Amino acid sequence: MTIYNQSLSSKEYISHHLKNLQIDLRTFKIVQENDSSSFWFLNIDSLFFSFFLGIIFLLFFNYISKKFTIGTPGRIQASIEILVEFINSNVKDIFGHNTNKIIPPLSLTIFVWLFLMNLMDLIPVDFVPYIANFIFNISELRIVPSSDINITLSMSLGVFLLILYFGIKNKGIVVFLKEFFFQPFNNYLLIPVNLVLELISLLSKPVSLSLRLFGNIYSGELIFILISGLLPWWLQWILSVPWAIFHILIIILQAFIFMILTIIYLEMSLEKPDKNTI
């Protein structure tokens, strides 16, 4: 008997929809009892949908690039051009004319990929899990990658590595390390204090990026699940439709905030070193 043939209480229904499809990396078998605390368990549903949406993004933009025309553009091409111009203008506003050539395409990738991940939150709660259960007998499935802290933290760590890379490349390893020891207080006696402050400042960037995105999307997903689990089907639309309309703003806004903060952090890493640093 599948989970959708069972009579679940509201608590069981909500708990069920908050569980990921996991695989045990020690045995490479699907985990029967969901356990988010185990280091060796991998949320393969989050990985699958994030890669799947990434592939859709690449294929779609590759298709549009091949159909690109210099004359009067179609609606899709015009929309893409507006999006690209919007992102380029944001990058130029922050970087000025000294923009690194990797920043605009990186920003576009982050925005569109996160938008697609967040957009999955608008799909009805039971739609994809029911199909997966019917075809593959999968009992647990979550389809919103950005509601998984592992995905948001992974993306933030990628940005963090770029911050370190550009910082070291721009300033040199010696000056980069000196800034840890001699900022904000240019004094040998205050090196321990500087080190603690700089480490907190540096590590707070990926942590804040990941938790902000995760918290907003997870809470949105949870509200959809609560509406679906606590109300009868004929009453769900009264709350779910207005919330979905409002949630569209959150979906776009969170992708935009992640992109803008990434641009700002990378611009900070490319700033010229402080001349007062010892």
Curated annotation (Swiss-Prot):
Biological processes per GO annotation: proton motive force-driven plasma membrane ATP synthesis
Gene this chain is encoded by: atpB
Spans traversing the lipid bilayer: 41-61, 108-128, 149-168, 180-200, 222-242, 244-264
Organism: Wigglesworthia glossinidia brevipalpis
Pfam family, one: ATP-synt_A
One annotated GO molecular function: proton-transporting ATP synthase activity, rotational mechanism
Protein name per the record: ATP synthase subunit a
Keywords, sorted A to Z: ATP synthesis, Cell membrane, CF(0), Hydrogen ion transport, Ion transport, Membrane, Transmembrane, Transmembrane helix, Transport
Compartmental location: Cell membrane
CDD domains referenced in this protein's UniProt entry, alphabetically: ATP-synt_Fo_a_6
A GO CC term assigned to this protein in UniProt: plasma membrane
